[in-house]
Amino acid sequence: MSQYQQGYGDQTRRVDEYGNPLTSQGQVDQYGNPISGGGMTGATGHGHGHHQQHHGVGVDQTTGFGSNTGTGTGYGTHTGSGGTHTGGVGGYGTTTEYGSTNTGSGYGNTDIGGTGYGTGTGTGTTGYGATGGGTGVGYGGTGHDNRGVMDKIKEKIPGTDQNASTYGTGTGYGTTGIGHQQHGGDNRGVMDKIKEKIPGTDQNQYTHGTGTGTGTGYGTTGYGASGVGHQQHGEKGVMDKIKEKIPGTEQNTYGTGTGTGHGTTGYGSTGTGHGTTGYGDEQHHGEKKGIMEKIKEKLPGTGSCTGHGQGH
């Protein structure tokens, strides 16, 4: 045996590039496939598979998974002196990738509008109504003479002028002031009355009654008074009436009552102010005189004037 071994020598054991022993029989490639052929055995081809990983895209609140099958085909070609060897086909690899999807839930802050309360302040304006004014008109009334026939005849005689004038003027707001004038009956004798009838004698009686009332009210107009003049003629005897009929004699009796009332208009609650009525009263009372004194009054040139009475 040794000679054989020495004759042929010990053959060096060959291995491939990966360290696999190379034999003429029973050689396998890197995948374990048997290699057959004569001559020199080429290097074993290597197949490399390429694999791509795919990640599944997760949906919100869902776990996604993706499957991928990678196919790798590798050809290893080695040309040796003994022949050509083609490596086997690469294997198949299947990879299943599971991707977990993070689910993020975002919550936005909700602004809730509060209820605002506004306080409004209103200023009410109080209106004031104007107060109407009333105008009172005074009335002047003439009294009636309760005289006899002769007295009335004298009034009819031409040239005699007997004026009985009474003026009542009321100007104001409200009630009117009243002026009264009265001529009392003369309780005189016959001669006294004859003197009044003598021509040239002038007996004028003037009486002024002035009433002034001032009323002040708040709201409603105050009321004052305006005057009314009244005139009355006293009862006279027969001779007195005859004298009034004699031409040239003039007996004038003037009664004037003037009342003025002012009402002041106020604002607010209604009040009523009343003006006090002024009265002017004048009365002529009959004088009980002797016969000579009455005759003296009847003499021409003598005048009997009675003054003014004024009441406020």
UniProtKB/Swiss-Prot annotation:
<feature type="region of interest" description="Disordered">
    <location>
        <begin position="248"/>
        <end position="287"/>
    </location>
</feature>
<dbReference type="InterPro" id="IPR030513">
    <property type="entry name" value="Dehydrin_CS"/>
</dbReference>
<feature type="compositionally biased region" description="Gly residues">
    <location>
        <begin position="67"/>
        <end position="88"/>
    </location>
</feature>
<comment type="similarity">
    <text>Belongs to the plant dehydrin family.</text>
</comment>
<dbReference type="InterPro" id="IPR000167">
    <property type="entry name" value="Dehydrin"/>
</dbReference>
<keyword id="KW-0536">Nodulation</keyword>
<feature type="region of interest" description="Disordered">
    <location>
        <begin position="1"/>
        <end position="88"/>
    </location>
</feature>
<dbReference type="GO" id="GO:0009409">
    <property type="term" value="P:response to cold"/>
</dbReference>
<keyword id="KW-0346">Stress response</keyword>
<dbReference type="GO" id="GO:0009408">
    <property type="term" value="P:response to heat"/>
</dbReference>
<protein>
    <recommendedName>
        <fullName>Dehydrin CAS31</fullName>
    </recommendedName>
</protein>
<keyword id="KW-0963">Cytoplasm</keyword>
<feature type="compositionally biased region" description="Polar residues">
    <location>
        <begin position="21"/>
        <end position="30"/>
    </location>
</feature>
<dbReference type="GO" id="GO:0009414">
    <property type="term" value="P:response to water deprivation"/>
</dbReference>
<dbReference type="GO" id="GO:0009631">
    <property type="term" value="P:cold acclimation"/>
</dbReference>
<feature type="compositionally biased region" description="Low complexity">
    <location>
        <begin position="55"/>
        <end position="66"/>
    </location>
</feature>
<comment type="function">
    <text>Intrinsically disordered protein acting as a chaperone. Ensures leghemoglobins (e.g. LB120-1) protection from denaturation under thermal and drought stresses to delay root nodule nitrogenase inactivation and subsequent nodule senescence, thus supporting symbiotic nitrogen fixation (SNF).</text>
</comment>
<dbReference type="GO" id="GO:0009737">
    <property type="term" value="P:response to abscisic acid"/>
</dbReference>
<comment type="subunit">
    <text>Interacts with the leghemoglobin LB120-1 in the cytoplasm; this interaction leads to LB120-1 protection from denaturation under thermal and drought stresses.</text>
</comment>
<dbReference type="GO" id="GO:0009877">
    <property type="term" value="P:nodulation"/>
</dbReference>
<dbReference type="Pfam" id="PF00257">
    <property type="entry name" value="Dehydrin"/>
</dbReference>
<dbReference type="GO" id="GO:0005737">
    <property type="term" value="C:cytoplasm"/>
</dbReference>
<feature type="compositionally biased region" description="Gly residues">
    <location>
        <begin position="35"/>
        <end position="46"/>
    </location>
</feature>
<feature type="compositionally biased region" description="Gly residues">
    <location>
        <begin position="256"/>
        <end position="278"/>
    </location>
</feature>
